[in-house]
Amino acid sequence: MNSPIQPNTSRSDEEDFSADYPRHKHPAIRVVMMPRDTNALGTIFGGVILSEIDLAAAIEAHRYHSGRIATVAMDTIEFKRPVFVGDLVSFFTETTRVGTTSVTVKVSVWAQRRFGSHVRVPVTEASVTMVAVGEDGQKVPLERREPVDID
C-alpha cells in the first residue's frame, strides 16, 4: 500500500508527461517540498503552491517594471495532480498580456517525483495578473512594454 507522502511513481499516466516537460525554459522558482508543507491528507497544501505561484508571477512581472508589483487577480487555477513531500517542484512563467499598468502571467507548475523516479508531471496551472503600484498603493504605468532579463 502506498503512503500519501510516497507517490506510486510506476503509474503509466504520469510517465507519459516527461516528454512534455518544458526543458527549453528556465523555471522562475524551484522548490523541494518538505513535510512542513503538507495538509491533513499528507500531500502538499494547495496554499503552499499558490504562494510560490504568486512569487513566480511577480518575478516575471518585474521584467516589465522594477518598482512595486502587486497581485490583483488569480484568474484561473487548476490543480491537476497532488504534490508530494520530496517532489522537486518547478514554476515556469510566460507573459500572456502586457497592459498599461498590468502584466498577466501564466504559471505552469511541474513536479519531479523524488522517490526512485525521474518522472515529471504537470501538477498546477494558473493565470495571475500583477499590477504596478506607486508608493501610495495606486496603479502606475509600467516602465516598459518589452521585457528585460533580470538574472
Tell me what each language-model feature is:
Residues 2-11, 17-19, 23-29, 84-88, ...:
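HotDog/MaoC-like acyl-thioester-processing domains
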Residues 36:
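Catalytic core of tubulin tyrosine ligase-like
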Residues 47-67:
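Active-site helix/loop of acyl-thioester processing domains in fatty-acid/polyketide metabolism
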Residues 74-76, 125:
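Extracellular/lumenal ectodomain signal focusing on beta-strand-rich modules
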